[in-house]
């Protein structure tokens, strides 16, 4: 079992009005919001999830998660080194090392990249859910920490 220090219980009275769905088979992401008695689709976009390429890349884990943290720029390292490889914009963390974020920007480039033609095709990331940068910003702005549920399924 997982040691208690790594588990943050959610009270049984907690409800979620915002949900993110990631389909790793079809490589897409959707956001839904509970309004009144209905769930409304707020967005649907192509995405790229994690690929199996040990020791640095792994599949996006399947399961139910909660948005836990946000970083406007998530810095990442070059595989196997301590050298900065670049950053992923508008990163919303849903599990240890797993983020929903925009198109990665490899160093030394500093400007954002809106789209990648590989979105919606095959798994390519290290574990994260990569999507268009404008959509990642939407998720980043729209999904409150500890109040947004994330479903990763195949």
Per-region residue spans from a language model:
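Well-ordered beta-strand positions in beta-sheet-rich domains
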Residues: 1, 44-46, 64-66, 149
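Conserved hydrophobic/aromatic pocket- or pore-lining residues that grip, position, or stack substrates
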Residues: 29, 67, 92
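Exported/periplasmic cell-wall-interacting domains
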Residues: 62, 74-154
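A mature extracytoplasmic/lumenal domain signature
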Residues: 6, 26, 33-35, 71, ...
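A short, sequence-level motif marking secondary-structure junctions
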Residues: 4-8, 46-53, 104-108
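Short, surface-exposed secondary-structure junctions/capping segments
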Residues: 15-19, 56-70
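Boundary regions of SH3-family modules and the immediately adjacent low-complexity/disordered segments
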Residues: 1-18
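Glycine-rich catalytic cores of cysteine/serine-nucleophile enzymes that process amide/ester linkages
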Residues: 24-60
